[in-house]
A protein has these predicted regions:
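Pocket-lining segment of extracytoplasmic ligand-binding domains
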Residues: 93, 104, 167-262
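Bacterial N-terminal signal peptides that target proteins for export
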Residues: 2-18
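Ligand-binding clefts/hinges and TM-proximal coupling segments of bilobed small-molecule sensing domains
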Residues: 150-160, 228-298
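Bacterial N-terminal signal peptides
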Residues: 17-26
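An extracytoplasmic/periplasmic, membrane-proximal ligand-sensing/linker region
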Residues: 175, 179-186, 196-209, 215, ...
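Bilobed "Venus flytrap"/periplasmic-binding protein-like clamshell domains
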Residues: 35-58, 124-186
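A structural signal for short loop-to-beta-strand junctions that line the ligand-binding cleft
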Residues: 107-121, 236-244
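Pocket-flanking alpha-helical
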Residues: 68-109, 179-183, 199-207
Length: 329
């Protein structure tokens, strides 16, 4: 059957409306693509505060960063894999390695192995606090040790350290830092592990000199082969007279962008962070002063979408001056 003129006009108008609708949907899709999700940590933690600082910086540049709290490192990796609205996460540099060794879920394991680096953030030191007389990691054999909440970065790092050192505590107890310190001061456990940038507020404010507690040096050769050696400087805590050798991990901002659907937005995100670092140092959490975005991280490859966009900010970076963002010593 041949269409009459009115029918042809209606069909043409219908096609035009459909084209406009498709265009509008395309625009809406572009707007949605400017949304990014970032999984961090508990709402009182440094990771979450870093996320909020980034959100404030990015809002003025047209990127809506949605910052999510979490229960810890394992939760972060699972969220990156399983939750489509989350493309970015903050984890410790050894956490993904630990997860690939321990994670039974093959999909999560495969994704963890392939997560690329966006930027390094700052170092976090291993703090092992124990009752007097426990002078090295080996002395924790047969002892009761608190290792953080299950699934947290502290938890996974503690498991890795004891495995590397060949030390088997009588029990590794999962509890948060405040609970662990209360148990340690009461003599119900022998030691606690905390992995965080010094000074850790809890250890600075709640431990007293007459508690009879001290840091345990972390010097086992097998641990030093796998982790970066560092120290907690003398006087970092009021009850700590001498420097203590230990090891550190690095807090990392990582991505999970299956299908590379957010390549351009993550790249633009990276460019804004590079150019906005002086603002973050001035207006954000004090630990932004410790951040060096160009620092290489052993075993990690930066996302090529980040390299592509952030490299266009090199001149801006040099104009700002590296001294302004040199990590504290």
């Amino acid at each position: 059957m041949t269409l009459g003129r009115p029918s042809r006009v209606r069909a043409k108008r219908h096609a035009q409306c459909l084209a406009v609708l498709v265009l509008c949907l395309g625009i809406a899709g572009d707007v949605a693509a400017a949304d990014l999700g970032l999984i961090t940590a508990g709402e009182h933690g440094t990771y979450y505060h870093f996320g909020q600082d980034l959100r404030r910086l990015l809002t003025s540049q047209g990127i809506n960063l949605i910052v999510y709290p979490s229960n810890g490192a394992v939760d972060n990796v699972r969220a990156l894999v399983d939750r489509p609205g989350i493309q970015l996460g903050i984890v410790q540099s050894d956490v993904l390695t630990a997860m690939t060794d321990q994670q039974r879920n093959l999909a999560v394991r495969a994704a963890a192995e392939g997560m690329p680096l966006v930027f390094p953030l700052y170092d976090e030191q291993v703090h092992i606090v124990a009752r007097a007389g426990i002078n090295d990691v080996g002395a924790l054999k047969g002892r009761l040790v608190a290792i953080g909440r299950e699934g947290s970065g502290t938890y996974l790092t503690a498991l890795a350290l004891f495995q590397l050192a060949g030390v088997a505590p009588a029990a590794m107890i999962t509890m948060d830092g405040a609970q662990a310190l209360a148990h340690l001061r009461a003599g119900r456990i022998d030691a606690m592990v905390s992995v965080a940038a010094h000074p850790v507020r809890l250890l600075r404010d709640a431990v007293k000199l007459d508690d009879g507690l001290a840091f345990v040096p972390v010097t086992a050769p097998a641990i030093l082969d796998a982790y970066a050696a560092t120290e907690i400087p003398a006087g970092t805590y009021p009850w700590q007279p001498n420097a203590v050798p230990t090891v550190a991990v690095t807090a990392l901002l990582v991505a999970h962008d299956a299908g590379r659907h957010h390549c351009a937005t993550i790249g633009r995100f990276a460019q804004i962070v590079v150019e906005g670092l002086p603002w973050l140092v001035k207006n954000g959490h004090p630990y932004w002063k410790r951040v060096d975005l160009q620092r290489p991280v052993k075993g990690w490859e930066q996302y090529d979408c980040v390299r592509q966009y952030a490299s266009t900010s090199d001149r801006h970076w040099e104009a700002q001056g590296r001294a302004a963002v040199k990590p504290e010593r």
